[in-house]
Amino acid sequence: MKSRQKGKKKGSSKERVFGCDLREHLQHSGQEVPQVLRSCAEFVQEYGVVDGIYRLSGVSSNIQKLRQEFETERKPDLRRDVYLQDIHCVSSLCKAYFRELPDPLLTYRLYDKFAEAVAVQLEPERLVKILEVLQELPIQNYRTLEFLMRHLVHMASFSAQTNMHARNLAIVWAPNLLRSKDIEASGFNGTAAFMEVRVQSIVVEFILTHVDQLFRGDSLSAGVDLESGWKSLPGARASGSSEDLMPTSLPYHLPSILQAGDGPPQIRPYHTIIEIAEHKRKGSLKVRKWRSIFNLGRSGHETKRKLPLRVEDREEKSSKGTLRPAKSMDSLSAAAGASDEPEGLVGSSSSQPSSLMPESLESNSMEGEQEPEAEAPGSANSEPGTPRAGRSAVRALGSSRAERCAGVHISDPYNVNLPLHITSILSVPPNIISNVSLVRLTRGLECPALQPRPSPALGPGPPGSVGPLASDEKSEARSVPGPLDDSSPAAMTPALEDSLSQEVQDSFSFLEDLSSSEPEWVGVEEREVAKAEAAGAAGAAAFSLGEDDPGMGYLEELLRVGPQVEEFSVEPPLDDLSLDDTQYVLAPNCCSLDSAVSTPDVEEDYGEEVFLSAYDDLSPLLGPKPINWEGVGSLEEEAAGCGKQPPTQDEEEQACSETRQEKEAKPRSTSDNREEAEATPETEMEAGKADAEGGEAERSQKVMDSFKEGSREELEAKEENSEGREVESIKETKDVEKIIGEPGKDEEREIGREEGAEKGDDTPVDSDMDPEHVFQEDLVLEESWEVVHKHEAEKGRESETKELRRKSDLKSREDQGHSEDSGSPEEGDDRKEGVFSKEQKSIDVETEVMRGVGDHLEEGALSEGPGVELLRVDSTEEINEQTSEMKQAPLQPSEPEGMEAEGQLNPETCDLYSCPCGSAGGVGMRLASTLVQVRQVRSVPVVPPKPQFAKMPSAMCSKIHVAPASPCPRPGRLDGTPGEKAWGSRASWRNGGSLSFDAAVALARERQRTESQGVLRTQTCTGGGDYSLSSRTPPCSMILAHSSRPLSCLERPPEGTEGSEPRSRLSLPPRELHPVVPLVAPQRQTYAFETQTNHGKDEGV
């Protein structure tokens, strides 16, 4: 002792206790194990059964004091109050002793061998390997390691009180026992340091859990003494009984699947801190510092990464408690298993996947050693109903701090908290998204385009209704497949839910949170639902919850629907559109292939549900082609029949539905080609002519009167029933167009010309009108094709009809004055002033426009002749009358619906709507009124959505002309809300950029070539002063043959409109001043370029 003290005084390193070589120290001291270890172990075993022992740090001053005492006294009295009050200072000193050893207890030399040994997959082999490596340790190190391991096993047996089970102890002790010189030389930077930490913890944990197997009394020179000493320790088991140890190791053999065997490369950043229940956490700056050293700011789930040690390790970790960045005073593990007895350590160390379930971790950790099988149950419990086995397995491996996070219920695969735009996109399969090309970010709203559509089987129920809830409900449905949200009336289709891309679920499951998924959407969904119901088609299908995989619905509809319709909007690209907050919803209709052709009902819904621009640049096609007046007549007759019924929508609906049914039966076999499709409108016109010549005038007058009388009454009924009718009417219209279109092209053209000539007499009166008005008139004329057809049929009665129109214009002005929704008073004035002027202008402009359009349109049938102009003029007049009538009913959100409700639009008339495009090679334009479930779109500032969310067909992108959009007043809703006086505001859409009609036609042609069965639909919003609900009301009048080029291309915006500046013809010229004709709330008219090669598909739809 004297020599030691003397040497110590001299500063000789030999005499030092801390920081000296272990072997030298033991040789000098003559002890089997360092005195520091023995003293501290005994003290801790007696007094250290406290929470966080060996994990928490003691007071640094106490540690330093105790250190000095060991240096001087060699065996200080640890039972003094200072140490009893700060037990952690003793445990901290013990760790410090090993940490300061020049050569770690397991030595630098054997680091690689230990790493290789634990990399072995099978536990028995790993055990052998580890044993071999341990045999290579110096005897002093081996004895010291055995003593320490047995001490730790003993302490682990109190894991219930200390929360320090074998795994936690291994994590805490590993850095002090096993280190790599190479990694230390590198400065502990990069993944190597994390790998080291993982290897350390795996090695130490394995040794700790296999103490009895690895250390046998006979292997130690002083084994007998050590064993006796250990046996004397309370709770210590006879180390020699390997038999007892074996069962504990068995659990490990079962889980030997553990990835730990995969080796260090899989080792993920090691967390020195074990995850603890947060309620137990206590604070200590020192501990925080210490934790920061090992935690490296990593989250608890990183422990999962390192869990891949071996199955046993992984299980143990999970069962023992998840490792988490420990807060200073927290216990390292969530719950230590009572199983942490020396054997228990093994058992407990056989972590149970229960780590997935934080709550079960604690209990499981205790039970783990005893019930190795519990692991399986634990894992199963972790995600009881989860289909994602792979992800669940990963979770099971790792400690589940993340799972504990309330905000992120990883364990709940179905709930997803994502931005609405993301969920909406996710709701649709990627291929659908690309097809629709309508995917875009919506502000706070689900992308309607992504909304699930009711499959044709579901019925005409407005598909849009499904959309709002779709993504949220879908996520919820996933989480809780059983109960669907009550918010949706329709039961979710489990098949659709199942069909949801598993990949999407897997990729976003971590975000899933059931709690918040639906509420965000509820308002919007309700709104849409109401609209869908108003449409009358809502039904139970209206809300097939988002669970019905909207994506799957899309796929089914897109794939199976006969002629596939790829809709593109001539309006500014959706990507560029700025969404109006909740109102801007993309109707699923836009995306469904069915919408254009297959199911008129659905089509109607879809069509109007499209984003309606404030006003669509593309006005109804200006088809110079004369419309078959026979077809027109028939349309007028139908309209008249319906018009007579206007006061009662039910009657109208019945009549229209009957007509539609009849026509629907006919049309679907008619058009196999574009030519047929194009021809069908003409044929319809001809048929209409034949029928209408006799009684068009009378019928038109009756219809107009009925419109006037019933418009107001119908407005209400229309809002309710119009949607359903529109669907029917659209179907019928399509059918009628198909049936009538083929034979009547020639007749229609001839008649158009003749009538044009006749109307030419009247035309000069309209010449005063500005071309802009003419365009508007043309739009109106399209809507008032009935009237035009009637005029042509009656040719002699044109003057009378004009007078009636004038009267109707006056009435419409008054009506408009009453109902501002339908149109601004300016529109009313325009109508009054411009009925004749519009006719003239329309003739002039049409003539010019049609000439210009004729160049671009393959349809040579579009005649620029006066007949067409006259037709348009007449139609304009009729439209004015109808407009006045409709103005009375402007409240109807969806004019097409409203009109149909009024009886003006019959299914037949809707069919007649189709504009005769050119005969051959032309794109058949069909005016399809659609449900006005459209959300209002503001044409303005073009705000492209984030590129990853904006998906638009490449072909489309190239053709879209984006012009600076001028801000416009919020467009009124087409959903029938009268309060929104935004109809006029739609004109602002004109100012927004959009596809030129030529581009649209070119697109249509290209697509027709590539997709023989595909139906291109160009949807345009009829915006502008002339576009009034009333004008749109008479479907027959809308049948007017217009050049297939939309008027918007030709028209100029009224001076009053914001974007009135002149535009190039390709970019949709801005409107100029419109005559004071009252502008009924413009409604979106959908013109479909249809190449219906498969009429059979239409029928099937």
Curated annotation (Swiss-Prot):
Residues 451-465 have a biased composition (Pro residues). InterPro entries: PX-Rho_GAP, Rho_GTPase_activation_prot, RhoGAP_dom. GO terms for molecular function: GTPase activator activity. Its main location: cytoplasm. It is found in: Cytoplasmic vesicle. Coiled coil: none annotated. Keywords: Cytoplasmic vesicle, GTPase activation, Phosphoprotein. One of its GO terms (biological process) is signal transduction. SMART domains: RhoGAP. Residues 348-367 have a biased composition (Low complexity). The modification Phosphoserine is found at S578, S875, S996. Residues 305-397, 450-499, 622-848, 878-901, 968-987, 1044-1076 are annotated as: Disordered. CDD domains: RhoGAP_CdGAP. The record marks R55 as: Arginine finger. Residues 20-215 form the Rho-GAP domain. PANTHER family: CDC42 GTPASE-ACTIVATING PROTEIN, RHO GTPASE-ACTIVATING PROTEIN 30. Interacts with RHOU in a GTP-independent manner. GTPase-activating protein (GAP) for RAC1 and RHOA, but not for CDC42. This is Rho GTPase-activating protein 30. The lineage of its organism: Eukaryota, Metazoa, Chordata, Craniata, Vertebrata.
